[in-house]
């Protein structure tokens, strides 16, 4: 990096900003040198639709991010998700920036098609030149079909049905990426021992604690929707032992390992885990399991934080790893967290876990399979090419972040301090900084 000034001011990057109520009734005010460039809050009196679009940073390309459809949507949440997309796309080396959309309602209690049409109509001037949508919580490939038709441009979103040239997220691209991130992390730990890499004592202890057969490594997954269920499937393919999964309704656990293919078949016509038939006791559960049938005991959903496991994968909503749950994970021997969800860990919980030698693979690295697949769809390429590119990019990005974390460690401090999020974030920021400077007309950066 040369002596070109990288400390950009708001006037440097915000000349085209169209901010609508960036400090709302909830007191939210989030503007920094990175963005957001635009915050749109929209309302349609005919349908009652209320929505939010945050275009955070487009220096590397049009803003990319899904449309979340939920009662809990707030401008602050949408901004945080948009910012995560900025780092995610930069880390993955994609020609996209960061953005996110949100519709504020329970999709089961409104006319989802009409509300999606209304939202698309309201933000049409920005699609696809500044914003390219995708699915998220509460939206599916059919919503993307509606969105694209209303915008009048198939390039306005990804995750469309295959009949429209899409690569639906329902194929499991995000979950596959999470499994690749975990596999790469486990391979990295093996390399430490095999290659004799210099590492701190806690990191060596972590390596030794996971030096066992794949089917002896215990994994729990919080969330069993699209991301969580496919993560479980692909981890099962790697012969890892998934001992528990949860959703909003409950927690299914078997210390001997769940039959994931059977569980996915049993869930094919159900909307939540509590719809499964509960067994009376563990003996009955094991008996049915031996007969290739399964009877499930449904525990309280928060019990997932209280069971012994090696690896914890949050694959649902934001903020589930917090000051209350992080100590429970540590108490129950969690050694690695792979963030399948966006922003699942609060900053204070993240610091607490890192300080206590838990290795965290951050969301913008681990769950980038979805947006990588979106990029392949945007280029008009195939499903196979999507999975191949996810494999290639996430393997290399996670490996680079892990090795850079070792090299950045204070050699005088024999503690783990393997803060992958911090190291990977710095890399992403450098990429975005360079793009911002080039947009300003910098000749040498």
Model-predicted regions and their roles:
Residues 68, 185-186, 315, 328-445:
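Adenosine-phosphate binding glycine-rich loop
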Residues 80, 131-135, 156-159, 244-247, ...:
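General beta-strand structural signal in soluble alpha/beta enzymes
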Residues 1-172, 179:
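N-terminal ligand-binding/catalytic initiation module
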Residues 73-77, 110-114, 118, 138-142, ...:
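Conserved active-site and cofactor/substrate-binding residues in soluble primary-metabolism enzymes
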Residues 92-94, 129-135, 191-218, 409-425, ...:
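Flexible, glycine/charged-enriched surface loops at secondary-structure junctions
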Residues 169-308:
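Glycine-rich phosphate/diphosphate-binding loop of Rossmann-like nucleotide-binding domains
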Residues 298-309, 319-337:
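Rossmann-fold NAD(P) dinucleotide-binding segment
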